[in-house]
């Protein structure tokens, strides 16, 4: 089970790992907290506005999950408000879903090292949800840190997953989020040109790194 707050978090953050698990026949479910409806990116060139963005991002999310062949569950929280939600309530909500699915692994953001307040809040709630489960039934948690200083603060990640074997599928999932990815891809092209862009993207996105969460009190 992958738990992130926004459409595209799954594609940029863990789609290579997801694709590898799916190739092994492991079912994957994405619990997406919000529709990212308060995002600033409206496509490049612009094709969305504040009114149309929620529906556009929802369609992009469905498309990305289809490319990754994962089950999608949209949790219905409001974008940019996760930090103000009652963490225990969100954790209980997630716990109920996890107890239904019974996954062996949860991937989420590392609280405090995930840049965006929604990332930190959803990661904290996901880890709390697993903590609330019976120790005998707890899945492993892989927490993803993305802040600039995380290696200095946390040390080397426990898992560094080379996803170059499924890189094309990862890029398909990223590009499905056109309203968010088009500006980033355009910047790559502008800075490096097409071939160099592919190499730069592969270098930047070809590894997915995680810390194994330690639940020992």
Feature locations, PLM:
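Active-site rim/loop-helix segments in enzyme catalytic domains that contact anionic ligands
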Residues: 1-101, 128-137
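Metal-dependent de-N-acetylase/amidase catalytic core
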Residues: 1-3, 24, 71-73, 80-217
């Amino acid at each position: 089970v992958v738990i992130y707050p926004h459409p595209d978090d799954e594609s940029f953050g863990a789609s290579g790992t997801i694709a590898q698990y799916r190739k092994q026949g492991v079912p994957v479910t994405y619990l997406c907290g919000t529709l990212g409806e308060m995002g600033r990116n409206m496509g490049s060139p612009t094709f969305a506005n504040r009114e149309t963005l929620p529906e556009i991002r929802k369609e992009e999310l469905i498309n990305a999950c289809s490319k990754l062949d994962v089950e999608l569950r949209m949790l219905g929280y409001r974008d940019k408000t996760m930090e103000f939600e009652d963490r225990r309530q969100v954790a209980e909500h997630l716990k109920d879903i996890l107890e239904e699915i019974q996954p062996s692994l949860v991937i989420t953001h590392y609280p405090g090292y995930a840049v965006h307040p929604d990332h930190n809040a959803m990661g904290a709630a996901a880890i709390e949800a697993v903590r609330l489960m019976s120790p005998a039934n707890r899945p492993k948690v892989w927490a993803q840190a993305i802040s600039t200083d995380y290696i200095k603060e946390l040390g080397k990640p426990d898992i560094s997953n080379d996803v170059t074997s499924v890189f094309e599928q990862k890029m398909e999932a990223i590009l499905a989020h056109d309203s968010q990815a088009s500006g980033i891809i355009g910047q790559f092209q502008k800075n490096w040109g097409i071939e160099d862009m592919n190499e730069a993207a592969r270098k930047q996105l070809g590894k997915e790194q995680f810390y194994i969460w330690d639940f020992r009190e």
